[in-house]
């Protein structure tokens, strides 16, 4: 199963992706994060998250 990180999940695009995600539940596992969960300006935190969750794809919806 492909692991996908979506940043900025509280914005308009992030919200729309959350609505679509269940359609892909059989092939993809989405990890939706907001600023409190993952500060994308903290490079080390981002790389740690990617590594610890085996993320294959990052979709940046953060403004």
Segments from the language model and where they lie:
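Generic anion/oxyanion-binding catalytic loop in active/binding sites
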Residues: 2, 35, 47
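N-terminal Rossmann NAD(P)H-binding glycine-rich loop of SDR-like oxidoreductase domains
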Residues: 1-24
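Conserved Rossmann-fold cofactor-binding substructure of NAD(P)-dependent oxidoreductases
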Residues: 38-59
């Amino acid at each position: 199963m492909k692991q996908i990180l979506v940043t900025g999940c509280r914005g308009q695009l992030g919200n729309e992706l959350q609505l679509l995600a269940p359609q892909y539940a059989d092939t993809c596992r989405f990890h939706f994060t907001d600023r409190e969960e993952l500060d994308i300006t903290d490079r080390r935190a981002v790389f740690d998250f990617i590594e610890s969750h085996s993320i294959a794809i990052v979709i940046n919806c953060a403004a």
